[in-house]
């Protein structure tokens, strides 16, 4: 992702009936991760106008989450929503926080910038893969959502570039 915006933008939100923050990555100037409505402040920013490879992993067995920026672990904690299961059947939206399923968008929470190669897996990727992905534009394809799934649901003031505009991060 790349952004120089100063608003509390939302790269990713997944909402269900009854839980609008089932899975949310919010506020790229001081990231928050929300799972099942519970919030963890990451305290890492990515709104400096440069490309950043952002990856978040979470293991529900022990509640361990990891926040990677450009292939490096910036924050890791355990016991966050341990035993919780993210429910299927929701709506995933890139670039907006959903205050109700598929809507309730607030302009102040919209993502302003460029996103590329967004993928979602049902398992925790190995650190080695995350590091490799951060150094190339070949991110593989998520088994829940892959980047190409998003091009058909584009709405609003969104432009799709094909091929994508990914720039490798050189750490």
Model-flagged regions — what are they?
Residues 1-171:
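Extracellular glycan-associated modules
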